[in-house]
Amino acid sequence: MDSSNYFHDCKTMLSEHNESIESSNNDINGKQKEHIKKGNSENQDVDPDTNPDAVPDDDDDDDDNSNDESEYESSQMDSEKNKGSIKNSKNVVIYADGVYDMLHLGHMKQLEQAKKLFENTTLIVGVTSDNETKLFKGQVVQTLEERTETLKHIRWVDEIISPCPWVVTPEFLEKYKIDYVAHDDIPYANNQKKKKKKKSKGKSFSFDEENEDIYAWLKRAGKFKATQRTEGVSTTDLIVRILKNYEDYIERSLQRGIHPNELNIGVTKAQSIKMKKNLIRWGEKVTDELTKVTLTDKPLGTDFDQGVENLQVKFKELFKIWKNASNKLITDFTRKLEATSYLTSIQNIIDYEIENDDYASSNFDDETSS
């Protein structure tokens, strides 16, 4: 057998072997033995008329070639379909900007919505600077670095621009190849008083920062995608919750050893808050005691008298606490002003004047009597 027939024979046997995978194990073993037999007879002459394992005729070879060509054409068609699907699922760049101070559930849901606007999305998140946020919106709790670092740990975020411009411009969209800007649909006005006009490649767009939405031009240009806000969840709401219990947080911080200066309050304010909270707690205890006395099922008598005595003890304890706190407050105040020596000198002068008045009065009485 020449080499060309041998390789063709091997190709045929491999094809038969692949087709026999779905058949029984006996057929597979038979094909393997046949492959080994033909491999050992490489240098022997093969009679196509007598040997059933001989090389197929030219007609069978043409059929195999036609099958190979049809399979190739089919794979080419599948490849073209895949290319078409890739084009249809083109990557879309979405941009979402904000302050993202004290990152909360509302922020995370907004970023998730932006990420899922399209099947294949790259989400770029812009974080506003500390200075512009204070100028246009108000004081922030976290610094730019803290807000940026927090966003890095959100799964929906692909890229971060920090700091980002307060107002999105056409140049900004072109620079970062942004397709759409995602934000809630509520008009977002800029707090500046004057009207600015920005130019872009011979064209201009303007917005009244006091009355008009800064995203208005994006909406008109079809570059805006609205996201839904999470009701009842915002940074402002969180701060309001804290302020409602401001004195509770102050007292707890003082109990943990934090100095009043670190809380931006004076010593006098700190003592006042402590006294107020103590009085509130005492009042709650008195109310509970009165409730227990008045709601008792027992007849008034010894138990009632005992309850009154308990109230008297509580009042005495309150007076003692109040007196000690007042003395401490006055002492701290006088020490703070360093007025103790001044008050002592005034007292000495008063005592001296009284002594002189007594001496003069006694002399006057002696003279009149004589």
Curated annotation (Swiss-Prot):
Keywords: Lipid biosynthesis, Lipid metabolism, Nucleotidyltransferase, Phospholipid biosynthesis, Phospholipid metabolism, Transferase
Source organism, top-level taxon: Eukaryota
Main EC class the enzyme belongs to: transferase
Positions bound to CTP: 99-107, 137, 183-184, 188, 229-233
Known pathway: Phospholipid metabolism; phosphatidylcholine biosynthesis; phosphatidylcholine from phosphocholine: step 1/2
EC number of the protein: 2.7.7.15
Region (Disordered): 17-85
Cited InterPro entries: CCT (IPR041723), Cyt_trans-like (IPR004821), Pcy1-like (IPR045049), Rossmann-like_a/b/a_fold (IPR014729)
SUPFAM superfamilies: Nucleotidylyl transferase
Compositional bias ranges of the Basic and acidic residues kind: 30-40
Recorded GO MF terms: choline-phosphate cytidylyltransferase activity; phosphatidylcholine binding
Residue positions binding substrate: K137, W166
Regions of compositional bias (Acidic residues) in chain numbering: 44-72
Catalytic activity: phosphocholine + CTP + H(+) = CDP-choline + diphosphate
PANTHER family assigned to the protein according to its UniProt record, in alphabetical order: CHOLINE-PHOSPHATE CYTIDYLYLTRANSFERASE, CYTIDYLYLTRANSFERASE
Family: Belongs to the cytidylyltransferase family.
Function: Controls phosphatidylcholine synthesis.
Protein name: Choline-phosphate cytidylyltransferase
Gene source species: Plasmodium falciparum (isolate K1 / Thailand)
Organism ancestry: Eukaryota, Sar, Alveolata, Apicomplexa, Aconoidasida
